[in-house]
Amino acid sequence: MDRVLSRADKERLLELLKLPRQLWGDFGRMQQAYKQQSLLLHPDKGGSHALMQELNSLWGTFKTEVYNLRMNLGGTGFQGSPPRTAERGTEESGHSPLHDDYWSFSYGSKYFTREWNDFFRKWDPSYQSPPKTAESSEQPDLFCYEEPLLSPNPSSPTDTPAHTAGRRRNPCVAEPDDSISPDPPRTPVSRKRPRPAGATGGGGGGVHANGGSVFGHPTGGTSTPAHPPPYHSQGGSESMGGSDSSGFAEGSFRSDPRCESENESYSQSCSQSSFNATPPKKAREDPAPSDFPSSLTGYLSHAIYSNKTFPAFLVYSTKEKCKQLYDTIGKFRPEFKCLVHYEEGGMLFFLTMTKHRVSAVKNYCSKLCRSFLMCKAVTKPMECYQVVTAAPFQLITENKPGLHQFEFTDEPEEQKAVDWIMVADFALENNLDDPLLIMGYYLDFAKEVPSCIKCSKEETRLQIHWKNHRKHAENADLFLNCKAQKTICQQAAASLASRRLKLVECTRSQLLKERLQQSLLRLKELGSSDALLYLAGVAWYQCLLEDFPQTLFKMLKLLTENVPKRRNILFRGPVNSGKTGLAAALISLLGGKSLNINCPADKLAFELGVAQDQFVVCFEDVKGQIALNKQLQPGMGVANLDNLRTTWNGSVKVNLEKKHSNKRSQLFPPCVCTMNEYLLPQTVWARFHMVLDFTCKPHLAQSLEKCEFLQRERIIQSGDTLALLLIWNFTSDVFDPDIQGLVKEVRDQFASECSYSLFCDILCNVQEGDDPLKDICDIAEYTVY
């Protein structure tokens, strides 16, 4: 190997292969390293073209030189010194070379016997070699020839070329290796065939120990016959050459009659060279089924690419394998299992207490089953069991006597849940649109009713609590332990849907009637002291404007009829003249929102979106650019109103939008506008149908200051005060027939608490700037609302 390459080339090749020097000559590792470095140095893989070219050149030279070296060892390598016996002579070694320098290492030779006897004596000194028989002593040295004999008709030595004559392999002479040959390797055409039953002796490969062929050929050459004799030979004695010394019985290559009967048609149709091939297998008479029986389709899961787990499975295979799986399925700890036969196959149905994937069960069964195997999960175990235990299926065995329906059903437990509808009705009845407020009420309802302090007092400001506590106590207990409290309250607070539906289905007169009815019901529940307090507010309003009851009636008519350009109302006057209090009372009575129109123009869109589904809106404290009173601050409110004339005019629908919601097209509701002494442009002035000029009245301000409860309880800003003013000054015929009875009842109630003369005394106290209830009711009796 040191002469294969020069020292420099050898070191360069090892460097390119990245191998240490001690691995030089290890062809296997060098070839593996060459393949790895080829992947790294190939130009298409990002390597160096020059290094790849150098590696290919050195490797090609190395392979060529190694090939030539091995070829040159054929006649000179071991002539003078046979392996492991170079020091001993020919007679001492127990074997002698033949004419082609071959030293016999084959089974049964003298050298083979001596070597193994020496080996056994090392371990057992008393070992004695078996006695030699006469036959074995005279038997020539045998050699097992392992290369194929490819001659189709070797009976005639003249038909076999000289280079294809049989030869013996010399283990002392290196043979050419195709793996390192520069030429492409030849495709092997040899096939292994069984050794004939009549062959005897150690060779059995078709060559005599003396170099002769079993077919009578001389074996002086080094080549083998091109083709072996046909397996089904008819002329056994002729082909065998009639030699008894070869160790083969005459006719040993004759075919078996059973093989002839099975392959008769095949042997007649095939060529002479095809007898070396394995005969084709016969087709199965009963092919494996492709799916479960159709009667089980409705009870099985047909999901293929799913990781879902199941507790019940059905395995379909052969009867023998199903019986084996029935005994070994204990890995999954089945609670129930049964073995069923169906036609030529079997089925294993089992249930487990834990869930498993179908792939896990199938993979386990496939380790024990080489025949067809199908496994699916059972979605309806009880129904599937009833089918597989009836005809045409046959139940073989089961680990317990059957399945029953009660094993799959539990007794229904009454699991009460929170009534979402009840919570939504509670919010709708009490006009609650704040989710947190609804949650607070319901958590408060979870307390015990008998020990509730709020219910025992029955205060007016707590009437929502003590009126609904007992009704919602049971549902509140479930709500207390519910995980979806916020979701329930958010849905209940979404009263916008019912309000929008009401706006579509009801007229504005009906909506006004409903609002008045709600106010009258609240007034009906007031006590005597609270009734006098609200009558004081009525007296204060009657002193605010001249003929105030008629003015209020006209305002309600304008806002209810909602005629374009005949619906908007303007309250204008100096500071502290009662504009804001009256506007707030109207919003409370009719239901609406107050808007800030003085904001920048880019924020007006969301501010106006608050007006969705409202009966009326109030533009509070609008500021203008030109003030009649120089002490007033200018603002952009009037300019914004001028730019939004089409919006609040009420002629066409406009798009109103809120945050996190889409725009909605609707008519903008009528508005009540309050402002100080600002100059209005003609375009804005034309949109107001009623203009009320307020003036400062010191006696009204003094009356409010002296009656603390009118301000603290916001009696002036309450819509119930305006509703009481209407029923106090108008007959019941003015109201809707549906609420005339309630109007009369509430009026009689207040008339019993306060006579007309007493009301006149209250009115006089207001006009004089005193406490409205002076000398009429003790202030300590007032109930805080």
Curated annotation (Swiss-Prot):
Annotated spans, Disordered: 74-97, 145-291
Zinc finger (T-ag D1-type): 415-508
Modifications made to the protein after synthesis: Phosphorylated on both serine and threonine residues. Small t antigen inhibits the dephosphorylation by the AC form of PP2A. O-Glycosylated near the C-terminal region.
One GO biological process term: symbiont-mediated suppression of host innate immune response
Subunit structure: Forms homohexamers in the presence of ATP. Interacts with host HDAC1. Interacts (via LXCXE domain) with host RB1; the interaction induces the aberrant dissociation of RB1-E2F1 complex thereby disrupting RB1's activity. Interacts (via LXCXE domain) with host pRB-related proteins RBL1 and RBL2. Interacts (via C-terminus) with host TOP1 and POLA1 allowing DNA replication. Interacts with host preinitiation complex components TBP, TFIIA and TFIID to regulate transcription initiation.
Described function: Isoform large T antigen is a key early protein essential for both driving viral replication and inducing cellular transformation. Plays a role in viral genome replication by driving entry of quiescent cells into the cell cycle and by autoregulating the synthesis of viral early mRNA. Displays highly oncogenic activities by corrupting the host cellular checkpoint mechanisms that guard cell division and the transcription, replication, and repair of DNA. Participates in the modulation of cellular gene expression preceeding viral DNA replication.
Name of the protein described by the UniProt record: Large T antigen
